[in-house]
Amino acid sequence: MFCVPSTETGAIMNITKGGLVLFSANSNSSCMELSKRIAERLGVEMGKVQVYQEPNRETRVQIQESVRGKDVFIIQTVSKDVNTTIMELLIMVYACKTSCAKSIIGVIPYFPYSKQCKMRKRGSIVSKLLASMMCKAGLTHLITMDLHQKEIQGFFNIPVDNLRASPFLLQYIQEEIPDYRNAVIVAKSPASAKRAQSFAERLRLGIAVIHGEAQDAESDMVDGRHSPPTAKNVAAIHRSLEIPMLIPKEKPPITVVGDVGGRIAIIVDDIIDDVDSFLAAAETLKERGAYKIFVMATHGLLSSDAPRLIEESAIDEVVVTNTIPHEIQKLQCPKIKTVDISMILSEAIRRIHNGESMSYLFRNIGLDD
């Protein structure tokens, strides 16, 4: 099982406080809860900064204490207005850079635009663009959690620590699901099978994979550079020179590979945003005989009508971490539960500031985790 720092809740960590400044880059007060938890664990005060919107909707950041020669940690959690969130971060990073901070470490538990990390049709790899902007602004190190694709780390030319929330979710399963030994870990599509396998192997449980219409359709659009030529061009091409094209994909009827009858089904994924695929998976699992259904994910974006749809669905409980604030969604849907991951973020900050190795936080993590 993954290793988690043994710091007890509320305990103050052993940290060299001199030369450390902790900022929250959020102008939205509801997004500052995670920052406060981290500061409390580290036993430090939040740095003095003012982040607000001008009447013309421009973002303004005013650093209200000296950061010269200090390690500055900027915590930024993503709000509904993701573009404002990004501008707040970039402006604060640049302000610290021009104020001669020794190092500027971004603590971004959920990396925005991480779903746009592949070329689709005539679009762009937006997460690469965002990584370049952060580095150009002055970021010297990034702490994040469960990137949507691990390859995003390669978009940066600075150190990136991609922490894992799995230890906390595994602990929740063991402590909060009394009969979890009768559970099966479910991947709602073949794309998430590796993550499900990682959970199943650590809990010594079986695995099931849902395949068919419920799987994500975005995999069909990975690269659109195969666009067919125009009709005029086709007429000009000799038949013998036509380039063979891939046969279009046709999804089979939805099916479950693995036995879930009379079991608890635990669906695992990294992000839960649009919940349609999770609802379809839950209905399928119910039809196959699962008597209880849990959904576990690191990042709970829970956009649009997600809380209402979850409340009305066959899902019994949705468990997410607090990488993204979702207090309003919890009020709308009591099925949503939160796991606090401030402990591991605090430990990462402490180790980086004290110049200690980060390898402890990655023990027992394999290439597929």
UniProtKB/Swiss-Prot annotation:
PANTHER family: PHOSPHORIBOSYL PYROPHOSPHATE SYNTHASE-ASSOCIATED PROTEIN 2, RIBOSE-PHOSPHATE DIPHOSPHOKINASE FAMILY MEMBER
Keyword match Nucleus: no
Name of this protein: Phosphoribosyl pyrophosphate synthase-associated protein 2
Coiled coil feature spans: none
GO MF annotation terms: enzyme regulator activity; magnesium ion binding
Family: Belongs to the ribose-phosphate pyrophosphokinase family.
Keyword entries, A-Z: Nucleotide biosynthesis
Highest rank taxon of the organism: Eukaryota
Listed GO biological process terms: 5-phosphoribose 1-diphosphate biosynthetic process; purine nucleotide biosynthetic process
Disulfide bonds: none
GO CC aspect terms: cytoplasm
Gene3D superfamilies (alphabetical): 3.40.50.2020
Stored NCBIfam families: ribP_PPkin
The encoding gene: PRPSAP2
Lineage per the UniProt record: Eukaryota, Metazoa, Chordata, Craniata, Vertebrata
Biological role stated in the UniProt entry: Seems to play a negative regulatory role in 5-phosphoribose 1-diphosphate synthesis.
N-terminal signal peptide: none
The UniProt record lists the keyword Signal: no
